[in-house]
Design a protein with these regions (language model features):
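Fe(II)/2-oxoglutarate oxygenase catalytic core
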Residues: 1-135, 139-183
Length: 183
């Protein structure tokens, strides 16, 4: 499901952008490796809340009881990003929320796809604008991607994982985050 303006109170938009961690490289960065401002911490708290978990459980007919949640941030998109993929089998649910005040680009808009071969064969295109939220159940055919875009592109990704996948997921993200400091 998707919500075009999940952040109904526009008065927080500016503080979210100002409080968003400075990320000038591509890739996902775990929340615990970043310095988050107050409004972003508050938003992450809401996204990780029991209330949000219950909404996702009802919507997707899954139990998230005792399932770990991992939150990552993206601040910069590279030309190589956006390739068609389905999420890792370690994930149960993926939630993405975009925090870009303005988006005047035709590229960089997430597309939920009908197949793994054609970026133009999509079910829905998600705006990359402030408060656009999309959530989906991870399946082997939950194909998504976007037309290549390079530049600032702010988003928060929340994933509910299978219990035995947390250490593997954390290791991969921490190693990747560490290596990005050098490349």
């Amino acid at each position: 499901f998707s919500v075009k303006d999940a952040l109904s109170s526009k008065k927080y938009h500016t503080s979210l952008v100002l409080d968003f961690p400075s990320i000038n490289k591509g890739g996902s960065f775990p929340s615990d490796s970043l310095s988050l401002g107050q409004s972003v911490q508050r938003l992450v708290g809401e996204l990780e809340s029991k209330k949000m978990k219950e909404i996702l459980e009802r919507k997707f007919q899954v139990s998230l009881k005792n399932k770990p949640v991992v939150t990552t941030f993206r601040g910069h998109s590279r030309m190589k990003d956006g390739k068609i993929h389905s999420d890792s089998k370690t994930k149960i649910i993926t939630v993405l929320i975009y925090l870009n005040v303005h988006w005047n680009h035709k590229n960089g808009l997430l597309r939920l796809l009908k197949d793994k071969k054609n970026l133009d064969n999509y079910i829905q295109e998600i705006p990359a604008t402030m408060g656009s939220l999309v959530a989906f159940k991870v399946t082997e055919n939950c194909w998504h991607g976007f037309q290549s875009y390079e530049g600032k592109r702010l988003s928060i990704q929340l994933n509910y994982l299978y219990e035995n996948a947390l250490s593997q997921h954390n290791f991969r993200h921490k190693l990747s985050s560490f290596l990005k400091k050098f490349f």
